[in-house]
Structures are given as C-alpha cells and as structure tokens.
C-alpha cells in the first residue's frame, strides 16, 4: 500500500491508502527529508461493509477503538501508544476521515510533544510572532484575522484550528498551522512564536484586559480540545497547558470589527503604541 508522509506541528505522520490525502495538501514532506523515526502511522481501508473488531487484522496490536459519532461507518483501531493506527471506513466522508486522522495524530502527539489543539484562528506578524484568536463558532475569529491582514499586513496562518507546542527549553510556545481549517480557506503550513492569546467577545465598544488565572481556565481552556478518550493523554494536555500559561498573555477583547480593535490588541500584545 502506497504511503505518503506529512509533517504537522513538527510531527511526522505517514498515511497509506485512500485518496483523502489530498486534504493534507501543503503539509507533504519532500522525499529527501523523510525519516522512519518518530513517525505516527495511519493506514486507511475503505469499503468495509460491516465493522467487526474480531475480523480486523492490522499489522499492529489493538488497544484502542475509535468511532466518529457524526459520521457513522468511520472507525479506527490503534496500538497502545497511538504510533500505529488503522482507519476502517464503510463509505468515506471527508470530515469523517479527517477526524480519524486528527484523533490518531493528536493522540500520538499529546503524550510526547507537550501539544494542545485549539479552536482558534492564527495570524503572524513577520519578524514579530503570532497572535491567536479564540472563541465560539461565529464570534469573529476569522474576521479579526482578516482585520489584522488588512490593517497590519499580518499573514493568516489558519482560520479555525491551531496546534500549540511548548518549546523544548520550556521558555516559549510555538503556534502551528494545521490542515483542519473549518469553513475558512486558511491553512498554511507555518509555525510562529506565539506572542498573545486573545479571547473574543462582541461588544458595542472596544476594550481589552488581561485575564486572571481563574478566568483563563473558564474562558480560554474551554476552547482547547481535550483527548477525553484517554485519561493519561488528558493529563498530558493539562500539564502542557499549565506550562504554557505563564509564558503567553491571555487577553479578553470585547470589540467591534474595526481598526481600533486591531490597534488596541496590537498595543496590548506587542507593547507598542499603534501607529
């Protein structure tokens, strides 16, 4: 079975089988840079007519079984540390297969790479770092990203889903684009030092303030995807969150969709007076 390698948030993932790999376009690893070390492997088998765990014979042990409730007929079995997974699909749907890929990758990374996955948009200011906008669906994450593009020349890395990793020295946080972008068209394969996290709220007047530790837990952490299927991985993600929080300011922006909101946030994150 032909396998393709991709690199997402610093993690290699090798996927074999299925045409769905086109959805990961832009995250391919060139042949000359591929490696077989520290690789998450997923094989995709389409056309299952019945799911019977006893009949599944992958070339790896089976300790975990996943199903996608929103996409019936999409299943996955994984070994103990999620290094090897086999996706079993009755009739492939793009969102279902991508959810399986995400479950395999996030499970593999959460226990190793001090990684969290956030419902957020991400912009990068060249030479300065990134700003991440967090909030419920429809609150204006992509709108804020576009305003930063318009008024500050920022580049939009992703409009909906972002990986964060704690740097090896524990002194910084890196934000990574991902192939998962929701309904937005933005999904660059780019990483940037994270300078600020902005929790969004719509309001008739613009204001911004730094959140307390308690507010961070209630207003920001609720937008982080926790791997609730595995208690150990959930503990790893919570530990990563705890390591990241002292390193990056978490702000609450109550705002209109205008330039003043951009300038106000710029000053709060980068410590400069907006010009």
What do these predicted ranges mean?
Residues 1-137, 147-157, 162-275:
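A noncatalytic interaction/capping subdomain that flanks phosphate/NTP-handling catalytic cores
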Residues 141:
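Conserved lysine of the Walker
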Residues 144:
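Hydrophobic positions on the alpha1 helix immediately C-terminal to the Walker A/P-loop
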């Amino acid at each position: 079975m032909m396998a393709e390698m991709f690199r997402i948030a610093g993690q290699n993932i090798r996927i074999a089988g299925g045409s769905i790999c086109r959805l990961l376009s832009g995250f391919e690893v060139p042949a000359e840079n591929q490696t077989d070390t520290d690789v998450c492997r997923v094989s995709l088998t389409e056309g299952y007519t019945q799911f019977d765990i006893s009949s599944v014979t992958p070339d790896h042990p089976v300790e975990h079984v996943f199903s996608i409730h929103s996409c019936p007929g999409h299943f996955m079995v994984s070994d103990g540390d999620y290094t090897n997974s086999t996706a079993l699909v009755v009739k492939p749907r793009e969102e279902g297969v991508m959810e399986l890929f995400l479950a395999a990758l996030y499970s593999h990374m959460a226990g190793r790479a001090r990684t969290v996955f956030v419902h957020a948009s991400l912009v990068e200011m060249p030479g300065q770092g990134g700003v991440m906008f967090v909030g419920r669906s429809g609150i204006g994450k992509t709108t804020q990203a576009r305003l930063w593009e318009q008024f500050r020349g920022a580049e939009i890395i992703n409009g909906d889903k972002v990986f964060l990793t704690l740097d090896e020295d524990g002194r910084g946080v890196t934000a990574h684009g991902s192939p998962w972008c929701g309904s937005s068209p933005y999904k660059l394969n780019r990483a940037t030092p994270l300078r600020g996290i902005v929790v969004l709220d719509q309001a008739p007047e613009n204001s911004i303030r730094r959140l307390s530790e308690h507010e961070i837990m209630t207003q920001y952490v609720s937008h982080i995807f926790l791997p609730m299927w595995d208690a150990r991985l959930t503990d790893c993600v919570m530990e990563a969150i705890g390591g990241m929080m002292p390193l990056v300011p978490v702000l609450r922006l109550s705002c209109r969709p205008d330039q003043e909101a951009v300038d106000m946030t710029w000053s709060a994150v980068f410590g400069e007076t907006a010009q």
